[in-house]
Amino acid sequence: MLSRLLKCKIHRAVVTHAELHYEGSCAIDGVLMDLAGIREYEEIHVWNVTNGKRFTTYAIRGEDNSGIISVNGGAAHQADVGDLVIIATFGDFTEAEANVHKPRLVYANPDNTVNHTANCIPVQVA
């Protein structure tokens, strides 16, 4: 049996564009994509921290070091410029793979440069 686990995420990126009439997708700065391990055209989940909306689309590569996070097509109704978002992908892993898997986590600064990276999420305390 396979388990679906978090493969990677870009945490607290800021939406720079919302292009309703652009052909679907979400353009992501290529540097962020590479660090997170997101492939072009890969399915992504976008969780809007600002308004609580969640949607699924696919990633396209934005210009390296541009800071672009552009929500395109119909998904542009789900995010406004300036919104904080989390962009995540998931993968299916065998039991052996799941036992050793560590996600790739990229934490963004407000200008969508990299603050830091990690491979585990801190324990949440009460």
UniProtKB/Swiss-Prot annotation:
Gene Ontology CC terms, in alphabetical order: cytosol
Matching Gene3D superfamilies: 2.40.40.20
E.C. numbers: 4.1.1.11
Keyword Cytoplasm recorded: yes
Location of Pyruvic acid (Ser) modifications: S25
Record text on cofactor binding: Binds 1 pyruvoyl group covalently per subunit.
Binding-site residues for substrate, renumbered to this chain: T57, G73, G74, A75
Obligatory cofactor(s): pyruvate
Top-level enzyme category: lyase
Entry keyword annotation includes Cell division: no
Alphabetized InterPro entries for the sequence: Asp_de-COase-like_dom_sf, Asp_decarbox
Quaternary state and interactors: Heterooctamer of four alpha and four beta subunits.
Cited NCBIfam families: panD (TIGR00223)
Protein name stated in the entry: Aspartate 1-decarboxylase
Source species of the chain: Acinetobacter baumannii (strain AYE)
Gene: panD
